[in-house]
């Protein structure tokens, strides 16, 4: 098979995969509880239109509370659309309002531990993430999505086995335009438990030191 034939075959397979993704996309319902936060984002977008070709950070409170983004990624055009307490399906549900309109060059996504804490299984969380990818890539097929691994935490240490299983499943995804950033091992101390100074007093949300650690893993993807 010639190089040209291989190129055409690769293009055909990519188009076929893209068509399959579109046909299997499922948009979850938009929960009213998040409407005030989403409307606040939309109001901000109207008064201060977000810049094009930005890096979009989206997900749960671990993204929303990342107030040092600009300092951690100097010179990078950023948008933060984290909303606290949300699960993966919530970001999918509101993707038409807080993801797709921005046409970001890169999406950095963190969510999943709220899902597990709510009683969902690793298989369910994995399914929600693959659906998120399907929905987003149906509209933005060449936008890379970086999944920050679900973190270990003091408050949810009992969920560590489910967290590790979920991370393992997501890390194995072979799709193009997907990356998995594994911050889990680096958040553990010599005794194998989460480092206390990487968390706020609630033992759940990241401290500034933790965000600096995360940034060191993510930064290479932004260049």
Where are these regions (language model features)?
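Conserved beta-strand elements of the Class I
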Residues: 56-58, 79
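Oxyanion-hole/transition-state-stabilizing segment in secreted/luminal serine hydrolases
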Residues: 63-79, 88-126, 146, 150-154
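A secondary-structure boundary/capping signal
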Residues: 58-59, 112, 183
């Amino acid at each position: 098979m010639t190089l040209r034939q291989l190129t055409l075959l690769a293009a055909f397979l990519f188009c076929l995969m893209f068509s399959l993704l579109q046909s299997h996309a499922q948009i979850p319902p938009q929960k009213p509880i998040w409407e005030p936060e989403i409307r606040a984002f939309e109001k901000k977008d109207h008064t201060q239109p977000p810049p094009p070709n930005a890096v979009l950070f989206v997900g749960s409170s671990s993204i929303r509370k990342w107030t040092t983004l600009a300092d951690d990624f100097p010179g990078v055009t950023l948008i933060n659309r984290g909303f606290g307490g949300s699960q993966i399906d919530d970001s999918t549900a509101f993707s038409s309002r807080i993801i797709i309109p921005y046409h970001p060059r890169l999406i950095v996504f963190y969510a999943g531990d709220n899902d597990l804490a709510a009683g969902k299984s690793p298989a369910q969380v994995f399914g929600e993430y693959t659906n998120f990818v399907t929905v987003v890539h149906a509209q933005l097929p060449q936008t890379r999505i970086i999944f920050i691994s679900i973190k270990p935490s003091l408050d949810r240490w009992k969920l560590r086995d489910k967290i590790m299983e979920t991370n393992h499943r997501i890390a194995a995804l072979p799709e193009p335009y997907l990356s998995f950033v594994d911050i889990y091992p680096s958040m553990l101390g010599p005794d194998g438990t989460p480092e206390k100074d990487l968390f706020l007093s609630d033992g759940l949300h990241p401290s500034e030191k933790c965000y600096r650690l995360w940034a060191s893993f993510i930064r290479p993807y932004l260049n």
